[in-house]
Every structure is written in structure tokens, then in C-alpha cells.
């Protein structure tokens, strides 16, 4: 899989109409781990496993499902759901200095860095909610 930075917007929003209830939300951009996603309802960030679960990932798209008792019911005038990707800035693979070259692992690592670059672009080009990214960048030690 290859992530095309120009074709990848790591943010999607949904409007749940007044009185309607929705429990599943499509994540139409690639992510790797459940913790890569932020889920907001009317501007309030929800907690993974407490308010929602994630299916998919591993470099693919997926779905966020609300947990029991946490479905999104449209408030007066509707409710807004926003899903963003926020991949922790970290190198997760270490390649040995000898042995077989691991092309698939290298491609996954490069896809992660491309996704991180896309997340940073989103930080500067989209309205809130977008918390998390700057607070997770490593300090200069």
C-alpha cells in the first residue's frame, strides 16, 4: 500500500440530524493503530474503548463504532461528529545492519511517515478540532 499525500485528507466530519441516532462512522483515510484516531462529538473529544471502538487500520481505512450507551443522537439543530488522524511521531522499526532487506516493513514505515506529514499539513490547513499533534511531538533534548 502507498499513501498519496496529495490525495489523503486525514479528517472527516458527519452531521447527525436532530433526533436521529448513529452508531457507526466510516473512516475514509488510512490509519495504522486504533490510537491514531481522534473522535469528537460536538467539539468534545471522546475516549477510545470508553466511548468508541475502531475496526480496520493497519494501513487501511476503517470504521468507528460507538460503545453501548454512547450512540450519537442529533441534538437540536443536529450534532457534528469529526474524526481526525493523529499518528504519534516516532520511528517504530529498526532495520538490522545485515540480513535480508525487509521491503514490506520499509514500505509500511514510509507510509507512516507520509501519513504523519499529512497530519501536520492538516494542523495548518483545517479548523479545530485538531488537538494532540503538537503536544505529542518530541521535545528537543
Located regions from the model:
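Compositionally biased low-complexity segments at domain edges in trafficked proteins
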Residues: 111-126
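N-terminal assembly/attachment segments of tailed bacteriophage virion structural proteins
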Residues: 1-110
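Single conserved hydrophobic/aromatic residue that forms the stacking wall/gate
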Residues: 124-127, 131-141
Amino acid at each position: 500500500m502507498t499513501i498519496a499525500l496529495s490525495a489523503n485528507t486525514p479528517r472527516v466530519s458527519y452531521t447527525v440530524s436532530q433526533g436521529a441516532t448513529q452508531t457507526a462512522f466510516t473512516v475514509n483515510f488510512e490509519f495504522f493503530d486504533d490510537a491514531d484516531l481522534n473522535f469528537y462529538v460536538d467539539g468534545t473529544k471522546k475516549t477510545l474503548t470508553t466511548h468508541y471502538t475502531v475496526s480496520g487500520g493497519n494501513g487501511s481505512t476503517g470504521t468507528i463504532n460507538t460503545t453501548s450507551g454512547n450512540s450519537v443522537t442529533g441534538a437540536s439543530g443536529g450534532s457534528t461528529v469529526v474524526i481526525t488522524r493523529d499518528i504519534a511521531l516516532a520511528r517504530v522499526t529498526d532495520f538490522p545492519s545485515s540480513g535480508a532487506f525487509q521491503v514490506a516493513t520499509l514500505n509500511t514505515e514510509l507510509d507512516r511517515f507520509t501519513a504523519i506529514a499529512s497530519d501536520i499539513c492538516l494542523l495548518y490547513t483545517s479548523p479545530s478540532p485538531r488537538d494532540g499533534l503538537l503536544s505529542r511531538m518530541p521535545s528537543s533534548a
